[in-house]
């Protein structure tokens, strides 16, 4: 295992991405690392994803706005790989402003990012209702993300740059409703959408720019830049647990695709891995449990979705999935989060392999089943570890952790094959252990 420790001085452009089904603790990591950067840029997703951040005892919830907004010197970029519901962006911005956090002057929105219309939300609800009646519910957040990416691929979507040419934008909105909305009053709804976006245009027009060029020039100028991924790698549209995935590229390569970062840019990649597994909504979950361990993890980990308020499903850490995601992303270092949540468990299990239920063969390490049907052919193989009772939330030195906690961390580190440089031991952004 190569040990390449991260340094703000050496690694001026770096990336943070989740290694599971989201909710790994990326928001806390972004706020921690963005204190010393000039720019934080998001490259995928929309207001379906959420970060819950606790800074100096105050709780903040972010969906569209990058975590760098918590630091007054940081420019925050929404890249062209995102789909942006401007009304939700405004609401989020207003809440931050109430807490004394200025956003607008430090916000850059890609002119190539797609606008998520209210029509996309209506389409999403109708599609999920049809799937539910057919027994094929996906568990979408019902925020229009999938339909917006769909119209992007169908080349009927509307981009931020269109908003800067008002007559052109108004026509595109009306054409969009005519093509995609089977409502009797679609013309009236289209007009409402246009009028709503006129107000939003007045607020956000000055933020819309060529962010790809901005990013390239910033890299050339030697700016310190954090690239922020939404959702988690197991939700990637191509490599995740399809169809129970999101509609964008959530892997590290998405930073190049969704921000226009030059392909020769030296990006240091940081993976965020939670010490247990969680999932929101439908989809396969091989290591899920329903016993007292669930009660402990769900309660102590506050495992409730930031965007949907849905209670998260919980399970043991899945190393089959983690090794697979590490193979795809090649993270240089990993931030291992929420170790404090495991405190009090007598026994902690880790899934180390998948075993075929019929012939007992073990799935090759680094692989992950490509379909739900093939995944169901396997069962998890567990290895057990002793737990600990000591409160670790105030510990700042690695060697002060209980020996059993260190054994757990070091086993996972060896199996994943990347340096675990940071360990999260509490909710606050300052509750972190840095390993040499």
Curated annotation (Swiss-Prot):
Fetch the SUPFAM superfamilies from UniProt.
P-loop containing nucleoside triphosphate hydrolases
Per UniProt, IMP binds at 23-26, 48-51, 141, 155, 231, 246, 310
Q: Which residues bind substrate?
A: 306-312
**Note accompanying the cofactor annotation:** Binds 1 Mg(2+) ion per subunit.
Main localisation, per the record?
A: cytoplasm
Q: Which cofactor does it need?
A: Mg(2+)
The Enzyme Commission number assigned here is 6.3.4.4
Q: Which NCBIfam families match?
A: PRK01117.1, purA
Self-association and partners: Homodimer.
Q: What is this protein called?
A: Adenylosuccinate synthetase
């Amino acid at each position: 295992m190569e040990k390449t420790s991260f340094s703000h001085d050496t690694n001026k452009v770096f990336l943070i991405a989740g290694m599971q089904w989201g909710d790994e603790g990326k928001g806390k990591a972004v706020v921690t690392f963005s204190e010393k950067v000039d720019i934080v840029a998001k490259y995928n997703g929309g207001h379906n994803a959420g970060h819950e951040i606790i800074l100096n005892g105050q709780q903040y919830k972010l969906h569209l706005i990058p975590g760098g907004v918590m630091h007054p010197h940081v420019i925050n970029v929404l890249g062209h790989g995102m789909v942006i519901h401007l009304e939700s962006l405004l609401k989020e911005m207003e809440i931050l402003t109430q807490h004394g956090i200025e956003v607008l002057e430090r916000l850059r929105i890609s002119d190539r990012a797609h606008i998520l219309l209210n029509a996309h939300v209506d389409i999403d609800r109708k599609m999920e209702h049809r799937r539910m009646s057919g027994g094929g519910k996906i568990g979408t957040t019902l925020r229009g993300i999938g339909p917006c990416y769909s119209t992007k691929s169908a080349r009927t979507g509307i981009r931020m740059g269109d908003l800067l040419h008002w007559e052109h934008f108004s026509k595109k909105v009306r054409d969009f409703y005519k093509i995609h909305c089977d409502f009797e009053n679609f013309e009236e709804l289209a007009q409402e959408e246009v009028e709503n976006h006129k107000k939003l245009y007045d607020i956000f027009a000055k933020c819309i720019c060529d962010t790809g060029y901005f990013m390239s020039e910033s890299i050339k100028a030697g700016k310190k830049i954090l690239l922020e991924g939404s959702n988690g790698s197991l939700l990637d549209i191509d490599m995740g647990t399809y169809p129970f995935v999101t509609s964008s590229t959530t892997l590290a390569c998405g930073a190049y695709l969704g921000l226009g970062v030059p392909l020769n840019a030296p990006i240091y990649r940081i993976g965020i891995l939670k010490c247990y597994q969680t999932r929101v909504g439908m989809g396969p979950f091989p290591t899920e449990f329903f016993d007292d361990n669930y009660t402990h993890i769900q309660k102590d980990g506050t495992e409730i979705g930031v965007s949907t308020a849905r209670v998260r499903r919980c399970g043991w850490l899945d190393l089959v999935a983690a090794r697979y995601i590490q193979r795809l992303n090649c993270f240089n270092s990993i931030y291992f989060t929420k170790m404090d949540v495991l405190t009090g468990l007598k026994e902690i299990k880790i899934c180390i392999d998948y075993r075929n239920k019929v012939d007992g063969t073990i799935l090759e390490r680094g692989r992950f089943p490509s379909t739900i049907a093939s995944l169901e052919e396997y069962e998890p193989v567990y290895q057990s570890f002793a737990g600990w009772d000591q409160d670790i939330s105030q510990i700042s030195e690695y060697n002060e952790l209980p020996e059993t906690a260190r054994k757990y961390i070091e086993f996972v580190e060896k199996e994943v094959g990347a340096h675990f440089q940071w360990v999260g031991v509490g909710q606050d952004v300052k509750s972190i252990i840095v390993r040499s």
